[in-house]
Amino acid sequence: MGKTLFEKVWNAHVVTEVKDGPSILYIDKQLIHEVTSPQAFAGIEKRGIGVFRPERTLATPDHNVPTKGQNLPIVEDLSRFQVDKLTENCNKFGVTLYGLGHASQGVVHVVGPETGTTLPGMTIVCGDSHTSTHGAFGSIAFGIGTSEVEQVLATQCLMQTKAKTLKIEINGKLAKGVTAKDVILYVIAQISAAGGTGYFVEYCGSAITSLSMEARMTICNMSIEMGARGGMIAPDETTFNYIKGREFAPKGAKWDEAVAYWKTLYSDSDAVFDKTLKYDAADIGPMITYGTNPGMGISVNKNIPSLDSIEESNKVTFNKALDYMGFHAGDSLIGKQVNWVFLGSCTNGRIEDLRQFAEFVKGKQKAANINALIVPGSKQVEKQAIAEGIDKVLAEAGFELREPGCSACLAMNEDKVPKGEYCVSTSNRNFEGRQGPGARTLLVSPLTAAAIAVSGKIVDVREMLN
């Protein structure tokens, strides 16, 4: 019987299997940031051991960092402490750190791929839910807890139970105005925020293989939002072209050897998945969430579901979400005013996202009622945006390109949305209070965010495209 992509990568990393228990899995790369690493470093220090393979760990501060004035001391005490502690720990244990001011600093899931740290066939972990981003390269990548961060620092291994496999096949061509973010929001809306629980997802089909690497990262990034352990896409020429020449990519003969191996990383034609779902790209429109989990999503031109259409077991959650958001069952969102637009995060803070946003707003003006946060995912993205003149296009339209960080994706830094206000966000989570106490989040694509930013209200971007 053939093997799935997940099985091939998993089997290549099993050190040993525990009878009737988990496997001990070798971890190729661990990415760390300032929030989930202090306790892990404290743990290995208390035990009197070092980092087993420091060259396989890469650190960068992202969650707590300000997106303006990064040359100045961080104002908030806890944020400053955590960023300083990361620097101290990396220096003490010999871990590579891209600190504030470094040319490669940024959101950890943007930095990994753009530096060539992320490669096909790897196992990659991070104390962060959206580690699944790296699965776009055909790697097994997943988020772990702080105690597991410590395990990997100490041993470069992790005990893991093998997940089931879920194949999500999407064929056809995406319509104008529909992007990768809409694809993943559509899938999550179809299967719910818990529909992927217990599975590792492989995305495939013509609609997936036609996407750029940055678009594929957007899709894999949000795998966790359907409850899945992670998501993967088989590497192909698009993958290889993206990686080639990057700082830590293999060079010379090693590149040829690597590509030869990477070309074996696909699901065999006779591989058996535990579950398969198929979708038609033509059915997907520009998406927007209306509730308090990413599964509460609709095409922007559709109405919020009626209460009668909601399963009995979900009605309490549905009503609670609508009450928090200030919406009603059956409402149309078209025309509703919003207060904030956030472009950024590990989901949509890459150069293609900035290009898409800037191209749309060029020659237009930010609506007067909109507060905008335009945040590149890394210093490299920021540098590229400036080189392309994106900062000037944004400025002429009334927007400001800020410095890199997680920003308004989560309320752990200065970029917070005030209570009761609506933020149209290109990030990955719309939980209660995610962007600030009482903040109301609506998840969208960068293209839809751009349309709303210049309109001041929720619109269907397709009606504004030539």
Curated annotation (Swiss-Prot):
This is 3-isopropylmalate dehydratase large subunit. Heterodimer of LeuC and LeuD. InterPro entries: 3-IsopropMal_deHydase_lsu, Acnase/IPM_dHydase_lsu_aba_1/3, Acoase/IPM_deHydtase_lsu_aba, Aconitase_4Fe-4S_BS, Aconitase_4Fe-4S_dom, IPM_dehydratase_rel_enz, IPMI_cat. Its EC number is 4.2.1.33. NCBIfam families: leuC, PRK05478.1, PRK12466.1. SUPFAM superfamilies: Aconitase iron-sulfur domain. The keyword Secreted does not apply. One of its GO terms (molecular function) is metal ion binding. GO terms for biological process: L-leucine biosynthetic process. Catalyzes the isomerization between 2-isopropylmalate and 3-isopropylmalate, via the formation of 2-isopropylmaleate. PANTHER family: 3-ISOPROPYLMALATE DEHYDRATASE, HOMOACONITASE, MITOCHONDRIAL-RELATED. It comes from the Bacteria. Binds 1 [4Fe-4S] cluster per subunit. Keywords: 4Fe-4S, Amino-acid biosynthesis, Branched-chain amino acid biosynthesis, Iron, Iron-sulfur, Leucine biosynthesis, Lyase, Metal-binding.
